[in-house]
Amino acid sequence: MNIFEELKARGLVFQTTDEEALVKALTEGQVSYYTGYDPTADSLHLGHLVAILTSRRLQLAGHKPYALVGGATGLIGDPSFKDAERILQTKETVLDWSQKIKEQLSCFLDFDNGENKAELVNNYDWFSQISFIDFLRDVGKHFTINYMMSKDSVKKRIETGISYTEFAYQVMQGYDFYELNAKHNVTLQIGGSDQWGNMTAGTELLRKKADKTGHVMTVPLITDATGKKFGKSEGNAIWLDAKKTSPYEMYQFWLNVMDDDAVRFLKIFTFLSLDEIAAIEEQFNAARHERLAQKTLAREVVTLVHGEAAYQQALNITEQLFAGAIKNLSAAELKQGLSNVPNYQVQAEDSLNIVDMLVTAGISPSKRQAREDLQNGAIYLNGERLQDLDYSLSTADRIDNQLTVIRRGKKKYAVLTY
């Protein structure tokens, strides 16, 4: 099975410009290819991982990746399928975000070894050197307005209004391909399926300006079995930066993937072989309640993104919280595992009597209910049942002198911080 066949088998090929020519190029020698990442935030997220890992698979097959950080295009904003114009960021912000994205990409691509080691480029380096007049004369003249307006990515915005700034975005992305081809002999661009219009602008410019053929391959935009956009949890993006999304949160995200998605995601997001995935699928289908596919997915992706130690910590937090063994975890681990739990900052004037604190922290709606909860054995302090109505919290109840965990029943938590 050649690399293109494997990508197809993993569900990673959505559309190509000329499949036969692309397969021929990939099987006959080393291909230099690139994927672009606009710095629209200070971190990449799970949605970016599809293209990043596809790029890594091609590198492992002997091809040479170029990771393009859009320091210039990030200043403009891609209008593709957006309902409204993006808020323009300052140059300083985009520069800072560009640097952070560079650092993240180095975790996935090999920038150090072999003749096909990855290269990092920033399109600000060339766009900052081109005058507006030269850009219009040398690049703009190759694009007709009819061609630019025909792109599905901007048709919707034409109806509601689009600035010239965003309208010109596809020409800038097209020039990226031309520049990388001229300087590095890059002949293939990889990106999300929503980028098709911008990406083919590059092959158009290559054909008209240099009389060369470029290839485009898009990866699918991933949705779950219900059709919901992938990569978000409770409406929040799952970031690759551990400071924005903890390894535990990422672990839980994968652990809660639906059965109908789990095996498909193993093919897309892990480097397990297709034979290994087939064996997992067989075991998974025989006992879905054991969630083997989800557990494997969580292990593989968290280890890939954050490392083995972070995976082991996420697994330990999961197991200890499930067992109610709060005292087996550090304050730092509890902050990860209980990040979505209501947090109450204890004030100097607060009563530390347990009945009062249950009401103050929002665990029980009233003192009467708090007393009943205690008497019925429904209250747990740092994982241990508490029934003493006269109990007062002390420094001994603070884990690492930072926090106390109170639970009512099985699921209602509050974290007290000091």
Curated annotation (Swiss-Prot):
S-S pairs: none
Known catalytic reactions: tRNA(Tyr) + L-tyrosine + ATP = L-tyrosyl-tRNA(Tyr) + AMP + diphosphate + H(+)
Known EC number: 6.1.1.1
Subcellular localization: Cytoplasm
Superkingdom of source: Bacteria
CC annotations in GO: cytosol
Name by which UniProt lists this protein: Tyrosine--tRNA ligase
UniProt organism field: Streptococcus equi subsp. equi (strain 4047)
